[in-house]
């Protein structure tokens, strides 16, 4: 399936697009600090 963009809902980092990570407990994708 499609990856989740910034502030998209997620269950794990693998749900998120490149350079995003799933914020545990908040359940959304946010920048992981990489370029």
From Swiss-Prot:
The keyword Amino-acid biosynthesis does not apply. Pfam families: Toxin_12 (PF07740). Disulfide bonds join 3-17, 10-22, 16-29. Keywords: Amidation, Disulfide bond, Ion channel impairing toxin, Knottin, Neurotoxin, Potassium channel impairing toxin, Secreted, Toxin, Voltage-gated potassium channel impairing toxin. The modification Phenylalanine amide is found at residue 35. GO terms for molecular function: ion channel inhibitor activity; potassium channel regulator activity; toxin activity. Coiled coil: none annotated. Expressed by the venom gland. It is found in: Secreted. InterPro entries: Huwentoxin-1. One of its GO terms (cellular component) is extracellular region. Selectively activates the mammalian capsaicin receptor TRPV1, a non-selective cation channel expressed by sensory neurons of the pain pathway. Is more potent than VaTx1, but less potent than VaTx3. Interacts with distinct regions of the channel than capsaicin, since it only acts on the extracellular face of the channel, and capsaicin binds to the cytosolic side. Also activates avian TRPV1, which is insensitive to capsaicin. Produce weak inhibition on potassium channels Kv2.1/KCNB1. Negative results: does not have effect on TRPV2, TRPV3, TRPV4, TRPA1, TRPM8, Kv1.2/KCNA2 or Kv4.2/KCND2. The presence of a 'disulfide through disulfide knot' structurally defines this protein as a knottin. This is Tau-theraphotoxin-Pc1b.
């Amino acid at each position: 399936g499609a990856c989740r963009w910034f502030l998209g809902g997620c269950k794990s980092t693998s749900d998120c697009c490149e350079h995003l990570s799933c914020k545990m407990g908040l359940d959304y994708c946010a920048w992981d600090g990489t370029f």
